[in-house]
Amino acid sequence: MRDKIRLVSTAGTGFFYTTDKNKRNMPEKMEIKKFDPKIRKHVLFKEAKIK
């Protein structure tokens, strides 16, 4: 079962990516380093719910 999630920047810029993940294989919250174009750096993105 794949659920849609938001990956929100921890830099505080408000930038986010949308993606999906398989909750059966990854029950914990996703954390991944990705590029934040607002500050032009790679930062940690954390999972949040899509409203």
Curated annotation (Swiss-Prot):
GO function terms (MF aspect): structural constituent of ribosome
Cross-referenced InterPro entries: Ribosomal_bL33 (IPR001705), Ribosomal_bL33_CS (IPR018264), Ribosomal_bL33_sf (IPR038584), Ribosomal_zn-bd (IPR011332)
Any one cellular-component term (Gene Ontology): cytosolic large ribosomal subunit
Gene Ontology BP annotations: translation
Keywords carried by this UniProt record: Ribonucleoprotein, Ribosomal protein
Chain segments annotated as transmembrane: none
Family of the protein in this entry: Belongs to the bacterial ribosomal protein bL33 family.
Name of protein: Large ribosomal subunit protein bL33
Taxonomy of the source species: Bacteria, Pseudomonadati, Pseudomonadota, Gammaproteobacteria, Alteromonadales
Gene name as annotated: rpmG
